[in-house]
């Protein structure tokens, strides 16, 4: 990511803040980063009971969302964008039922496993994005496309992941409030996973 001298984005107390006046790329990656931090905060510090708690008739859980967003990070920025190996557990997963297994299987994973899987997926995705931008920029075409041979730009892939986070960070707000009453838009000053 391009370096900035923005007093907000460069404040180590608030690493999730996007720049106030950055480039398009800085804003795009800054928003993705902010959503990642906010989601991780909403899902943080819970035991298995908290990660598996549901709200109303929904089958969504914070544990399921952790594993789902880990899969989004891993698959969008490896296999879908560049046809590179996403690693385990994604490589050997049974995708015949779509991604339902991701949500359902999260209940079998420990909190430590879920947090590690998510954190590793985000770290790897950041590396892939940084390298791809250095090699070809945000406008480069990826392998993701439609059935007519049109390919999506890396910008489109990043926007798809932002959309996914927007949807599920909203779910995480409600699920976390239902677990222990935690509310808020941003992590508290100095928070780290």
Model-predicted segments: where are they?
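Conserved FAD/dinucleotide-binding core of flavoprotein oxidoreductases
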Residues: 21
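Acidic/histidine-rich alpha-helical segments that form the ligand environment
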Residues: 98-140, 153-166
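Short, contiguous alpha-helical
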Residues: 2-17, 25-100, 142-193
């Amino acid at each position: 990511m391009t370096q900035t001298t923005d007093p907000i984005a460069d404040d180590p107390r608030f690493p999730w803040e996007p720049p106030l006046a950055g480039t398009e790329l800085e804003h795009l990656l800054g928003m993705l980063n902010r959503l990642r931090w906010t989601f991780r905060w909403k899902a943080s510090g819970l035991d298995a009971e908290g990660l598996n708690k549901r709200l109303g008739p929904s089958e969504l859980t914070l544990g399921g969302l952790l594993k789902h967003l880990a899969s989004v990070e891993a698959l969008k920025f490896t296999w879908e964008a560049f046809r590179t190996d996403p690693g385990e557990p994604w490589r050997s997963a049974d995708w015949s039922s779509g991604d339902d297994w991701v949500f359902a299987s999260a209940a079998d994973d420990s909190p430590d496993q879920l947090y590690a899987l998510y954190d590793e997926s985000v770290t790897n995705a950041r590396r892939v994005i940084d390298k791809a931008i250095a090699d070809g920029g945000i406008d480069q075409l990826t392998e993701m496309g439609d059935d007519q041979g049109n390919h999506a730009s890396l910008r489109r892939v990043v926007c798809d992941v932002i959309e996914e986070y927007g949807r599920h960070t909203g779910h995480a707000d409600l699920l976390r409030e239902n677990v222990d009453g935690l509310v808020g838009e941003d992590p508290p000053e100095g928070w780290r996973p």
